[in-house]
Amino acid sequence: MADFRTSTHRERWIFQTNDLMDRWGAANQRATETLVQYGTTRLKVDPVDGSLSYPEPAPDHVVGSSGVKPLSCEEERLMRVFYEQKIQEVCSAFKFPHKIQATAIIYFKRFYLQWSVMEHHPKHIMLTCIYSSCKVEENHVSAEELGKGIQQDHQIILNNEMIVLKSLDFDLIVYAPYRSIEGFVDDMEDFCRAGNGEHQRLQDLRQTAISQVDKMMLTDAPLLYTPGQLALAALHKSNDMHKILNFERYLESVFSRQHSDCPIEQFVGSINMINYLVEQLKIPTPKDMRHIDRKLKHCLDPSSQDEHKKKEKKSKHKSKRAANEAQLDS
């Protein structure tokens, strides 16, 4: 059985907050420079080997004069959170297990540590991450089925498969907190010497913790903490609601058996920080995303900005003409 302690997940994909900020900032800066140099951020992806090609440089008289504005780091963050929630919605619609949803979201998060959303549209990458997660977790769904189920061209899924895998460095084994929750709840039954009544209450604790993990997956926590830490943070929050056991005593029991080098006070601090990240989570609505989505569309296809301006001008002209006609009729 695979072991998290010796995994690439633990070795290569758990970061400090500053590391994440640096990576997102670098990707945003690169995309911004691409927009200035080429007049667009769109990269062409070879579907066979995942190699990239840039467009022809924009003429000197066009560079910097198109009026297309790059997304800010904060706008990129909102875009990522929005599509991470979309991953959950799609997986729920297909009735995929939590493990597939979690793996797809972690793939998505890892991908956008390498790239800006201005370089690869998250709607397309989202689908490829779900498809890749299904393959790795042996829940076989064809690209055609997935595309048809959400009314998207399945070829987009396949075209982005290699660039996603390469961006993940082919580290495809992901550890999610859901399995850790199951293990800890079983352990809590022994700790509480649970009878029939306690057993049902522990199952309620488990279900609430799973819902808490669903929220955690939309924060930075999966890139900052181990699955075990995430699971215990979710169970701690759930226990605050159900009040089934003395959680501090339970943690002491876990630490005494695992002979952990980490002081329990430090671990409790991590749990509190994870739950703080969840409390701070704000999921943008489609209305919130409208302006950001328009900016992204213009970055990927600057000609769309001209079309948008023409429509706005035409709409204003119609409104003005209607107002004039109304005055003539009065």
Swiss-Prot record:
Biased composition (Basic residues): 310-321
Biological process, per Gene Ontology: cell division; regulation of transcription by RNA polymerase II; transcription initiation at RNA polymerase II promoter
Tissue specificity annotation: Expressed in roots, nodes and internodes, and at lower levels in shoots and leaves. Expressed in the intercalary meristem of internodes and at lower levels in the elongation zone and differentiation zone.
GO-annotated molecular function: cyclin-dependent protein serine/threonine kinase regulator activity
Segments for region (Disordered): 297-330
Superkingdom of origin: Eukaryota
Any one Gene Ontology cellular component term annotated for this protein: transcription factor TFIIK complex
UniProt similarity note: Belongs to the cyclin family. Cyclin F subfamily.
Record text on subunit structure and interactions: Interacts specifically with CDKD-1/CAK-R2.
Name of the protein in question: Cyclin-H1-1
